[in-house]
Amino acid sequence: MCRPLVTLLAILLGLAAHAGAQDLTLQEIILRAKPAVAVVVAEVGGQVTLRCGGVEKTVSPVPYRESGSGFFLSPRGWLVTNGHVVVVAQEPPRRWMTAHLVEKAFRAECLPGLLTRRGLAPGERPEVEDGLVREAVAATPADRVTLEPTVSVILQNGARLAARIAKYSAPARGEGMSGRDLALLRVEASDMPTLALGDSGAVKIGDKISVIGFPTVVMTHELLSATAKAQASVTHGSVSSFKQDRANQPVIQTDAAAEAGTSGGPALNADGAVVGVMTFVTQGDGGAVQGFNFVIPSAAVRDFLSGTTVALDETSRFNAAWHAGLADFFSGSYSRAARPLAEANRLLPEVPDVLRITAEAMARAKTQPLLPWGQVGGALVLAGFAGYGVLLWRRRQRNLFRISPSEVARLLEGTEPPAILDVRETTAYERSPVRIPRSLRVTLGDLDDGGKRPAVDQKRLVVAYCT
């Protein structure tokens, strides 16, 4: 293959790869986004000192827990979620929480012994158990209970990181969620996956939207493994309306399915940018009523972040590696995908989607031909057309074209006969009995050397005979 054709093939293949990289599928958009979404857990634990059968005990009951979703906006560990997801840790309802923890402690440490002394089995007399619990709660003063609120973030590789609440906007009191129900969390981490904030002002009714989060119904499903529960779920829908909450603040209505636990998760547009944060769902007698869920616009998130040190334009090294690996994978360059995918796994180990795509790329690379023949074939066809076009262009530039012997004979009989040059090789000329009448004998070597030039009017048509 000649060098110009090789160069042309390289250019065509490069252009094809570049065009493919700009056209992301929904699958690739979702895979890019998922690692940046995490579980947010708010807990209130503590220590309860109470009397069990005349003996004083200090008990650490099972903490009260609320969970939701959140997503990283900065590789330095800044994460956004809903305010109501972390409200129990930010503003613990002390009276209710104290009674809750006392009950938990009493049922775990004191109740079994009291029932045994009364000759009762657990669950045999529920009304007796409830009465004993009420007595214990009433007899335990609040100063015997120490509350310990905490917030943590669980990544999709199962890692649990302690978090602090850096900024908080409470939901509207007594009137459900407000639409400015936001919290900014910080974990001690670097190279986190991130999502970019989009322009909620550009969102239109009918636009496609994808919501990523951790619905409780999936997190608590008895048929799923612990690894499966740690992976985010994705639902799809459209923007159905623009409304205002009770505080007259704008919210976006969507028919994308959402459940408890999805709160705080990102709502993505068709480009994978965050245009909102899932905030509340419509509840009916049987649970959430799907098709009527609401999203805080990303413009409100930007306003909420003002005055903080969150850098929204900071590059995530994980994103760079993960996105490059996905681009190679979806373009069919499975072997080339290995390096960026390995880098993504090094920066954030054991993310299920990274492991799955890596394994699939390795399997496909083993059965992939050395060259992408589909692309090569297409490029060769394009190169053929391009080469033919170049040839025609060069001939037109040089006024060169082929004519048949019969056409030459016709021209010789015309009023302006052409000049005939016999440019056959010397050996061929000497061996051949063919001689062309009124032709001029000259070799190509003579023409190239610039020595022997035929005396021909440049305005005349020149026919060269070389076969």
Locate the predicted segments by residue.
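Catalytic-histidine neighborhood of serine endopeptidases
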Residues: 74-170
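C-terminal subregion of chymotrypsin/trypsin-like serine protease catalytic domains
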Residues: 83, 87, 94, 248, ...
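Catalytic nucleophile loop of clan PA
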Residues: 71-72, 202-205, 257-278
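Catalytic cysteine-centered active loop of the rhodanese-like fold, especially the PTP/DSP P-loop
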Residues: 451-467
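Flexible, polar/low-complexity N-terminal or interdomain linker segments that lie immediately upstream
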Residues: 369-433
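Short, aromatic-rich amphipathic segments at membrane interfaces
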Residues: 352-374
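N-terminal activation segment of mature serine protease catalytic domains
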Residues: 21-82, 180-183, 194
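Flexible, gly/ser-rich surface segments that form the specificity/activation loops bordering the active-site cleft
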Residues: 25, 65, 152-178, 195-250, ...
